[in-house]
Regions:
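A flexible loop/linker signature enriched in serine peptidases of the S9 family
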Residues: 2-17, 24-33, 39, 45-57, ...
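Residue-level detector of Asp-centered blade-edge/turn motifs that repeat once per structural unit
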Residues: 39-40, 82-84, 135-136, 192-193, ...
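Non-catalytic extracellular/periplasmic "stalk"
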Residues: 259-263, 271-273
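Signature of short aromatic-glycine-proline-rich micro-motifs recurring in repeat-based ectodomains
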Residues: 278-287
């Protein structure tokens, strides 16, 4: 819990959980995202499209050249470490023939791959988002994915909103639904006691952090943000929660007030603030201003305004 990994402008950074100057770990012009810590805190898995589509890469916590672990032609995203030597990730390689959406490419499966690389193994044909494994490895929490709803849409309630499930692992896996709100419940993480969990829910308005026991009872609200939704919930072994709110990173412990992590990023811009282009054709939907001195038009998918002169 001493260091936070995050993505900013397509690169992976780390910063002390107490705040301070961020350290840039990746510098590739491709998009690097979704960092995930190994249990021992020594390595970080992340997704990058530096080879075309998104693949799973692994690097040391100090940075350096990352190692590419997956090579499938579809996108692959790390979700959690199974242990220090294995990563669980999402991919759409071979959909289960029993799936109601078969054949299709929308619903991903969960695969397992060694940190040394090699051939991946199918971990679950069921689409499990935001997997959180228990410390003893006997259970996992996840949120389901039932349909094509935009994950950034706010306050909707429908038959395809996400719910939290508890999966007991073993030869015959068993599943228990632990949230029943008609809106969005997602992003579960284990509490330090191993008998309860935190998660994000819109039950009281915008996304906030809530807590329940594994039976789905004893609901308790942890944060009370109102203006914007809480996103990207994670936790460390001691029960400190970390999340994003309004473009900033916060930490909180149950019973305490959230604290913003003050981060200093010293980096060059990857794009120019203003891009000058000479357009000689392709303008559509032209509209002259009421005073006749300006004209608005569409070009290359953007709206432009220019002087008649």
């Amino acid at each position: 819990g001493q260091t936070i990994a995050f993505s900013y402008q397509g690169d992976i950074y780390t910063v002390p959980s107490s705040g301070g100057k961020a350290r840039q770990l990746t510098t590739h012009p491709a998009h690097d995202t979704r960092p995930v810590w190994s249990p021992d805190g020594q390595r970080i898995a992340f997704a990058s499209n530096r080879s075309g589509n998104f693949d799973v890469f692994l690097m040391n916590k100090e940075g350096g050249e990352p190692k590419r672990l997956t090579t499938h032609s579809t996108n692959e995203y790390p979700t959690t470490f199974k242990d220090n030597g294995h990563i669980l990730y999402l991919a759409n390689v071979l959909q289960d023939a029993k799936d109601i959406q078969f054949p299709g490419t929308r619903f991903m499966q969960v695969y397992e791959i060694s940190t040394d690389g090699g051939r991946p193994d199918l971990y679950s044909s069921l689409y499990m988002e935001n997997i959180a494994l228990s410390k003893d490895g006997s259970k996992l929490l996840y949120n389901d994915y039932k349909g094509y709803e935009d994950p950034w849409r706010k306050h909707h309630q429908s038959s395809i909103t996400r719910d939290i499930w508890l999966c007991t692992l073993g030869k015959d896996r068993s599943f228990q639904k632990v949230t029943t709100f008609g809106g969005e419940d997602r992003n579960p993480v284990w509490a330090a006691d191993g008998a309860s969990f935190y998660y994000l829910s819109e039950e009281k308005g915008s996304f906030n952090i809530f807590k329940k026991d594994l039976a789905g009872n004893s609901e308790k609200q942890i944060t009370t943000h109102t203006t914007h939704p809480v996103r990207f919930l994670t936790s460390d072994n001691s029960g400190t929660l970390c999340y994003s709110y309004d473009g900033e990173i916060y930490t909180v412990k149950e019973g305490q007030k959230p604290a913003k992590v003050n981060i200093l990023i010293v980096a060059d811009k990857i794009e120019n603030d203003v891009i000058h282009r000479l357009l000689t054709d392709g303008a559509t939907d032209i509209a002259v201003s009421p005073n006749g001195k300006e004209v608005a038009f569409i070009a290359r998918g953007a709206v432009y305004v220019t002087s008649i002169e």
